[in-house]
């Protein structure tokens, strides 16, 4: 039995993943952004070990979420499933922290949560095939100066999620840290015409979080059914370290060194 946190598990792929983990006998903590959605998650997933509430569009909310999660002890796995998309937006949307909303929820929140929690055994960052269309500029990650394009901005956050997974895999060799493209899935975000079943997408998350065998006991990988893989440019170690430093500057929290002191297992 593993203790697993699935963020954004009030509905969509996250709820399916949490349900599958519970059915598999695991101790599962589900997450919702507010109390109303937490009540929905609790009703839908009565076998969950707990429901954690925290608004990932707020630095204070994410920090408080990490504090509440410490009551569960060291987590075996964290699935960073929560995310938002504003593909057709005509202009940037800022959070209360003055940060671009997709960047804060999709990238900065999983970084901050990871940095604040005791180092887990596994990390799963949910990326997207749209990462292939991302355009990383560390001097302008939030599109302050570049012309705004919601599609490109979202794609960039998904590429940054992939980069975070690899960067943390390098920093924490005793944690299995990987990124996953779940496909175009029939959810509120993906729409009713999407071809992929959320149950199948959830199984991919569960496999990376709890599976055994050489296929999943790896680290620093991007799992996808598509042909595209990131090239060495975006996975350059110096760029990855610069991304971690940028996230640390924005949050005021450094990602600590490897607490386990050994190779991933």
Role assignments for model-derived ranges:
Residues 1-29:
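Canonical Rossmann dinucleotide-binding motif of NAD(H)/NADP(H)-dependent dehydrogenases/reductases
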Residues 24-40:
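Conserved glycine-rich Rossmann-like NAD(P)H-binding loop of the short-chain dehydrogenase/reductase
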Residues 45-60:
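Rossmann-fold cofactor-recognition segment
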Residues 46-48, 68-80, 86-92:
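A glycine-rich helix->loop->beta "capping" turn
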Residues 57-73:
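Conserved Rossmann-fold cofactor-binding substructure of NAD(P)-dependent oxidoreductases
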Residues 83-94, 99-100, 122-174, 181-194:
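Catalytic loop of short-chain dehydrogenase/reductase
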Residues 179, 194-245, 249, 253-256, ...:
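C-terminal helical subdomain
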């Amino acid at each position: 039995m593993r203790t697993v946190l699935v963020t954004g598990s009030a509905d969509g792929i996250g709820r399916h993943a949490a349900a599958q983990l519970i059915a598999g006998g695991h101790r599962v903590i589900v997450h919702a952004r507010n109390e109303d959605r937490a009540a929905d998650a609790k009703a839908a997933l009565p076998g969950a070990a707990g429901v954690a509430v925290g608004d990932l569009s707020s630095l204070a909310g994410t920090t408080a979420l990490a504090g509440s999660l410490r009551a569960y002890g060291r987590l075996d796995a964290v699935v960073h499933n929560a995310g938002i998309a504003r593909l057709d937006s005509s202009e940037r949307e800022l959070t209360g922290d003055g940060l671009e909303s997709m960047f804060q929820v999709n990238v900065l929140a999983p970084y901050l949560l990871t940095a604040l929690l005791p180092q887990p055994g596994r990390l799963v960052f949910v990326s997207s095939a749209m990462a292939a269309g991302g355009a990383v500029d560390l001097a302008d990650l939030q599109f302050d100066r570049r012309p705004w394009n919601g599609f490109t901005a979202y794609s960039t956050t998904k590429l940054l999620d992939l980069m975070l997974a690899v960067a943390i895999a390098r920093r924490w060799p005793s944690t299995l840290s990987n990124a996953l493209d779940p496909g175009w899935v029939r959810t509120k975000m993906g729409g009713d015409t999407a071809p992929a079943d959320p149950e199948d997408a959830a199984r991919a998350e569960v496999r990376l979080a709890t599976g055994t065998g050489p296929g999943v006991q790896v680290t620093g990988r991007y799992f996808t059914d598509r042909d595209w893989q990131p090239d060495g440019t975006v996975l350059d170690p110096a760029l990855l370290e610069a991304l971690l430093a940028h996230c640390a500057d924005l949050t005021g929290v450094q990602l600590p060194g490897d607490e386990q002191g050994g190779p991933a297992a």
